[in-house]
Structure formats: C-alpha cells, structure tokens
C-alpha cells in the first residue's frame, strides 16, 4: 500500500535531521532574532481581574514617559479593527483585540503601549491605570450551570456556549441487555502548552506598496493572513505572513489572538516596524489552554466482559470566548470515545461552558487524548471491578483485524488496524506476567506497585495541503510546502521523500515553508497530518515534474517517452540501460530552450494539491509505577510504548515525537495543572508553580512498533500526538492499580491529591 520507493536510500532510514545544524550552531532565525531598522516594541496592559466592568483607563503617565510613542485603548483600536476570528457561528459573542466595557478573564488585553525600547514599554505599561468594578467570577463549569450563576456574557442569559451530541447504534438495547452497569466520574485538568519559544510578532508596513508584512510564530500562516485582512478591513493581497523557525507550539499557536491584530495595526498606524514577544508569564496566562473537562461515563457490559454500550455527559471548560478552534477539541471527545472497542450503542452529550478563564484551544491531541482517557480509564476500572485481567478484557472487546474497514457507532470508519498485535507486543516488552508477580510480592512487603495499560486509536489527516516543486538547471530541487513545522523535522522527512523519488542526494533538496508569498495555500501543521497529507502533495508535484523530465530525457536519448525509465538519479531506455543521461543533464536541458522539443516549454516546476482521507493510527502503552506509601510520590519503574503509524519514513523522527509526547503525557498524569483561585486569578503563573517534567522525572521509554499501512499514497499515518493520546491514562491506571481499591476521579496524581484520596477512603 502506498510505497512508491523500490530501493530507497533515505526513506525508512534513521536520517539525522537536516535542520539541526542551524539550531545547534545558533544560526536559526526565530522571531525574537528579527531586528528591523526603526523598530518599536509593544507591551500589553492586561486585566488583573477575571470579571469586571472597566470604569476608566488613564494613560497620561504612560504617554508622558520618555521613549513612549503611543498608548492604544479600545476606543483607538475600534476605529481601525474589527473582531477576532471565531468558530462559534452566528450569534456567538466575539472578542475584540482590546476589551471594551468589560473584562472576562485574567490577562485579557485592555491597552497596548508602544515604545522605542522593550523595557520602556514594559515600564510604561505599569503606569497605565485601569479602574474596575468587580463582578462575581465563575471559574468552575458545574457552578457555571447552576441557577443564579454569574454570567460571562449577560446578553446570552446562560453560560452554555454550545451543546454537541453524538449517538449511534442502539444504546437502549445495549443497556437493556446488560448484566453489569457502572457509572464513573472523571475530571481532566486544564493544561498549558509551554512551548520552549513563546508567541511573538514583528509587523512592518511597507509604505511604498501599502502592504503589511507580519512575521509571526503561527502554525497556520495562510489562515492568519486571511484573519489579519478581515480584522483590519484591507485586501488580502495587502497582507504577507512570514513564519521563520519556531520553537514548539503544541496547538497554542493556532488561534487568532488579540496581539495578531494589535501589532500589525500599530505598525500600520505608526509607519514603523513593531515587535511584541510574549513573556513566559503571559504565555501561561493568555495562550490558549487545553483539556479541561468533567465527565460522567455510564457503561454497560455482559458478565463475560463483553462491552455493550456507553452513555456520556461531558462538560467542557471553553473559557470566556469561543476563539478559533476552541470547539474542536471538545467535539472530538464524543466522536472518538469508542476507541478500539466494538460498542453496540452509545449516546453522548457535551456542553461547552463559558467561564471567566482564558479561552480554551487545541493542545497536542485536541480532544482525542480526552476521549481515549475516558474510555481507557473506564475499561481498566471495569475490568478490575469484574475480576477480569485488564489485558484480556481489552482483547475480548477489540475491533478484530478482519473487521477493517470498521465503522464505529459514532460514524468514524477506521481504515486499518491490528489492535491485539500492538497490545501483545507491548505486554511482551513490559514482561507483563513477571510484572504482575512483582506487584504481588511488593504488596506483601507493604509497597504500592501498580500496572496500567492503555490501548488507543486516534483520527488525523484532517487538512488539505499543497506543494510546489522546482528543479533548477543545476539539478537541485526546491520544495515549497503549505505545511508549517515547529520542531517536527519536516524538512528532513520531505527531503527524504524527494531525494528517493528522484534518486538524488538529500543534500540536493531544499524545503521551504511559512511565507504566504511563496508557500502555496494549505492547512499548516497540526493534527498529525503533515507527512501524510503534505508528503502526498509533494510527491504528486514530483510526479508531474518527472513526467516532463521523461519527455526531455526521451528527446536527448532519441527515444519514445514511454520507453524511458527514471531510476537512481538517471534516465535510461528500457532494455538498454547503457543509453542513459543523468538527472542534472536532463535538468540543464529542461532550462535550455534550444535543447527542448518544440512542444515543451523551458523550466521544471509543478504544483499539486492533496485532499486527504482520514487515517487512524493506534497503539498500546504500558506502565509500572511505585507509589511511596508515606510521601505519595509516584515513580515510574517501567514504561513501554508500541505504536502503529503505518509506513515509517524516518524512525528517528518517529521516536522523537513519541518521547516528546510521552513526556507531556507524563506531565498531565503526575504534575501539570492550570489552577485558578475563586476570584479567577491565575495561581500557576510561573514555572515554579506550573510544574513540567524535567530530565529527573522522565523515565527511559522502551519503544517498538507494528506496521499496518494506511490506504493512502504513502501508506503513512500520523504520530505527532500518539503518545499524548495513549500514555497519560496508562500512568493514571497504574497509579489507581497501586492504590486499589481506591478510585482516582481526577488528575494529576500529585502527592497532595493521592494523600487526600487515601485519607477519604
């Protein structure tokens, strides 16, 4: 399936990342490296209250400070700019770049200071005086739905942002024929993405052309270009977005933020470049946060362990506004809940709830980790309560290999899979039977050891992509892709594909992205779709270039194009391999009008667009933990991941994505949690409070894979979010097993939480 390489030199091999040289030598170009002549610096004045009316804003002291060029408030901005983008539809309250009349979350922008120096801008921002009238905030989704709760948007008369339902099969029959019915409650905390590089923007207004050039860290350059034009009321052709190197994103650089409007507007109004770089505390406070749900799961099963059906009621904490992509993670929860199991019926309801918090958004996995968490926590706990080994319980209920393509009760059609093979390999790698023996011996000695499993399936490949491929007369290949890397290694993977397709050296391939004047239209990078969709577009463009090169080679060889073969960086006549010309020779001829047939124009360039089909990567993760019975610290004794992302282009990149995702999943399971107090003030406003795993906490991961090719041009599936989708609940399941028969409703499994659980029984 979909593997156009006979004897690849690069594809399938652990090729070191070609982009790493510039990163390790400090020659990369990140947003804060940009220094333009006459550049000004912006600082944002943010609300220190979560819910309040703005009585007045006094900017005089800030404006009089030496070096300050301008101070903008809502009344200034509203003359020139509209609303932020939303995916909420008609009638949904839309945010403005600067709050007007009311603030609805801690950190919401209320003014912007522009100065000659970054630190002058910061100091002047402290001088802007805002008088507030406090309003009662609502920071808990369940409290937000109670009668008489404070309203985030009074005009709606409710805190319900949206309701999403997903049902299928026959849930009534499933529950009516069940021998066992259980109801569980789970709470998944809000998380911050914490990319190594925070967000940033440098905008410049070209007076000669009337164009805005916006340098940014955004994941979707073409979307941001469109949003910028719409918000500022200018033609799309007057906006150019350029993204350089980006130090991580994890979904936090997808949405349309206030600064995405404010900084370009300031550059346009002042006629000088303006830079804004998000501080770490700002990143924790105002970049979109992920997860954040409360769920009740009711499950029905036969006494044999056969799952029958499920009912879900989920509350999603959307924050104060529906920004672009706020809804997506929450709607994914219901659609992917069935996971790897055959359910006869399911019905679910998810209510998106407004709270006085920063808007939610995608975070590595975007709803699929939540869905997998809910079903895997349910399955593991139900198995233990029924006295069935959790591994065997899963095997009883897996979608079988021979059942693919398999349509779930929520409407997804899984294209391929072998879930049992992945689980068996993970169990073997873990030494499952030996670990079960270790657990029993440890318990006899008063130690708390637990084993947790997780088998997952995810959906990815949502976005269409395009590519432009050009071969120069020197034989070098240039690729422009609509994808937008921020650490994944796309330049390496794409160069591998192109090098093997043409049979040339990987050093002869250059991959460019991120400039809307050069890169073709497409979906950017997110959702584990880059290689499968972006790679397919690149190969389609390569094929069109190849077809022209075959005609040129045939002309040089005085042969019929149908008889010419491209292989190993040369073109030869089928059956007469000695009649051959090299790749560079053909490329040179293709740019020489005199060397071409009359009906062939000079140049080697092709564009291709790929509209993808969904793919469904899967895997099995297993974890052994020990919980200290006195301090309740959790220590990972062993961690195993077996994942299936179809054909593998670069195993080094795959392993890097899995380890990185597993570290973030470990953070969700044991350490990370965005905390607000009752006033909506952010408690975890620094990395001293928002704890992320360090090298000390990260275990050694044992990684393996199965290979089930997907039915697409490359046979690949996504892997960028696999570990965040599968690993978290393996850890939590292991902790719950160690404390069994106690139950864990929430996460992370911090010592304080585990102590509370054990104290309350």
Question: What does each of the following model-derived ranges do?
Answer:
Residues 236, 249-271, 275-277, 490-498:
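Thiamine diphosphate
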Residues 13, 19-22, 89, 93, ...:
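Glycine-rich loop/linker segments at domain edges
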Residues 42, 212-216, 476-481, 636-638:
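Short, aliphatic-rich beta-strand segments
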């Amino acid at each position: 399936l979909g593997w156009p390489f006979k004897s690849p030199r690069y594809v399938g091999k652990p090729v070191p990342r070609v982009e790493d040289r510039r990163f390790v030598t400090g020659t990369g170009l990140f947003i804060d490296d940009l220094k333009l002549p006459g550049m000004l610096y912006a600082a944002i004045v943010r609300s220190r209250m979560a819910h309040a009316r703005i009585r007045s804003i006094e900017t005089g002291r800030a404006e009089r400070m030496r070096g300050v060029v301008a101070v903008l408030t809502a009344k200034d901005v509203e003359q020139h700019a509209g609303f932020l983008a939303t995916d909420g539809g008609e009638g949904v309250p839309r945010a403005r770049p600067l709050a007007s009349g009311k603030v609805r979350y801690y950190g919401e922008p209320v003014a912007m200071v522009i100065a000659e120096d970054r630190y002058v801008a910061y100091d002047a921002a402290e001088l802007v005086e805002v008088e507030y009238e406090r309003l009662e905030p609502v920071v808990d989704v369940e409290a937000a739905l109670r009668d008489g709760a404070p309203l985030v948007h009074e005009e709606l008369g409710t805190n319900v942002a949206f309701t999403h339902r997903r049902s299928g099969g026959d849930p009534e029959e499933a529950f009516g024929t069940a021998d066992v019915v259980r109801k569980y409650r789970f709470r998944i905390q809000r998380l911050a993405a914490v990319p190594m590089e925070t967000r940033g923007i440098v905008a410049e207004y070209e007076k000669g052309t009337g164009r805005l050039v916006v340098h940014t860290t955004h994941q979707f350059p073409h979307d941001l270009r469109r949003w910028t034009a719409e918000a500022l009321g200018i033609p799309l052709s007057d906006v150019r977005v350029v993204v350089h190197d980006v130090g991580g994103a994890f979904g936090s650089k997808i949405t349309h933020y206030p600064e995405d409007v404010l900084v370009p507007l300031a550059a346009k109004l002042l006629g000088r470049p303006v830079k804004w770089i998000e501080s770490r505390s700002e990143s924790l406070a105002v970049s979109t946060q992920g997860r954040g749900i409360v769920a009740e799961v009711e499950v029905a099963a036969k006494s044999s362990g056969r799952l029958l059906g499920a009912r879900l009621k989920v509350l999603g904490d959307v924050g104060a506004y529906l920004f672009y992509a706020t809804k997506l993670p929450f709607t994914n929860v219901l659609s992917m809940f069935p996971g790897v199991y055959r359910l006869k019926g399911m019905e679910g309801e998810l209510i998106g709830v407004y709270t006085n918090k920063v808007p939610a958004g995608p975070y590595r996995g975007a709803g699929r980790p939540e869905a997998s968490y809910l079903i895997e926590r349910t399955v593991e706990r139900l198995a233990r309560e029924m006295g069935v080994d959790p591994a065997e319980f899963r095997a009883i209920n897996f979608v079988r290999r021979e059942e693919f393509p398999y349509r779930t009760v929520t409407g997804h059609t899984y294209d391929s899979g072998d879930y049992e093979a992945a689980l068996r390999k993970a169990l073997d790698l873990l030494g499952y039977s030996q670990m079960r023996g270790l657990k029993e011996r440890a318990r006899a000695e008063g130690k708390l050891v637990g084993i947790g499993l997780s088998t997952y399936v995810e959906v990815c490949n949502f976005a269409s992509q395009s590519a432009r491929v050009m071969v120069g007369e020197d034989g070098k290949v240039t690729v422009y892709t609509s994808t937008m890397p921020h650490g994944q290694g796309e330049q390496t993977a794409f160069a591998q594909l192109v090098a093997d397709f043409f049979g040339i050296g990987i050093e002869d391939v250059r991959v460019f992205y991120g400039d809307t004047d050069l890169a073709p239209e497409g979906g950017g990078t997110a959702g584990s779709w880059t290689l499968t969709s972006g790679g397919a577009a690149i190969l389609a463009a390569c094929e069109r270039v190849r077809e022209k090169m075959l005609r040129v080679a045939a002309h040089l060889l005085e042969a019929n194009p149908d008889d010419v073969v491209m292989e190993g960086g040369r073109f030869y006549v089928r059956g007469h391999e000695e009649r051959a010309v090299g790749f560079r020779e053909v490329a040179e001829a293709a740019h020489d009008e005199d060397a071409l047939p009359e009906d062939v124009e000079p140049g080697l360039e092709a564009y291709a667009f790929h509209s993808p089909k969904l793919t469904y990567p899967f895997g099995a993760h297993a974890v052994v933990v020990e919980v200290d019975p006195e301090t309740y610290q959790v220590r990972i004794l062993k961690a195993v991941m077996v994942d299936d992302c179809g054909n593998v282009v670069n195993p080094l990149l795959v392993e890097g994505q899995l380890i990185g995702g597993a570290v973030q999943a470990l953070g969700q399971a044991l350490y990370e949690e965005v905390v607000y107090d009752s006033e909506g003030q952010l408690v975890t406003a620094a990395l001293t409070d928002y704890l992320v795993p360090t090298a000390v906490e990260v275990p050694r991961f044992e990684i393996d894979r199965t290979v089930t090719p997907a039915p697409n041009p490359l046979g690949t599936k996504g892997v960028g979010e696999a570990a965040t989708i599968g690993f978290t609940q393996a850890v939590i399941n292991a902790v719950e097993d160690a404390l069994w028969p106690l139950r864990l409703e929430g996460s992370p499994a911090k010592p304080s939480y585990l102590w509370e659980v054990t104290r309350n029984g």
